[in-house]
Amino acid sequence: MTSFPRQELAKALSEASGPSKRPTQGQHAFTRITVQDSSATVECYNGVMRCASVVNAIVGSGIDILVHAEMLQSAIENTKAESVEITPEPNRIKLKVGSRVASVPTLPVADNWTERQERRALTRIQVSNHDAFVPILKIAHGIAKLSKFDDRKHVEITPENGHIRVACSNGYQTLWAKCDCITKGSGTTAVPVEAIDEMLKAASSSMLIRVFDNAIAYNSGSLSLESSIRADSKLVTPMIPRVMESHRKPDSPSAIVDRIELINAIKSADSVSQKRAIPSVKVEIDIAKTVVSCDNSETSVTSDVPADTIGATSFRFAASDIVG
């Protein structure tokens, strides 16, 4: 019998179970739990992505099991019990969670598990500005996941001297952003949106990204992730500077505004926008201000945001992905 702190085990299962929710074969719906000394590794792999998380303060004997991830997660939820007792049996484990007793199926590890292969990283990125990087990653993820084309369902990361470029496009929206990082290596990597999903679940102040010849690895807090890289991705990063240059004109209308004030104005307008047949927000660049507005025939909202402006213009855009 081996005893786990319930909340820590639930957290590790939540962080690591992403691949088990996208199984490509039957055994990929299972998670491997390995206990050695007083810590355990919870790991899931689906042939494309691998996630692992660590649980400490384990009491009892060492175990190595491949257990159904969703059933295990369900068995330890919605209880005030502080510990989970696991006893391995042939083809299953017995669980005791407070007064609750359950049985969860297992598979033989030797026949149904692929070990991680050690390899040398071509690129290393140490994120030094977590507060700036995570919002950029969230916006990029929101844009990329809306693409109707598989070859664009990714976020591109390009290390440069002292920072990284983050870029993506879904054919309608395009993002190109920069964030300070400690970098080593070069080249653009297309990270699948599924991997970005998992990265955002465990984005801590300590974030390390490593790129291999055909995979990307990510470490943050207690989570370790490794994902294959899309080989057939359509890269937008090399095209963006040329596209921006071709559309940029001297003294074209522009505005410098306070980010928080602008976001609050967009959120107010977007709440009204959702009742329009085609949700959109109107932005007007005027003298010393930017006006954000929307009406839906029932409600109208207008916000003036002080700005340092050049020229005047107006345009409409869908705001949900920016403020979401």
Residues of each region from the PLM?
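Structural preference for solvent-exposed beta-strand-turn elements
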Residues: M1-G324
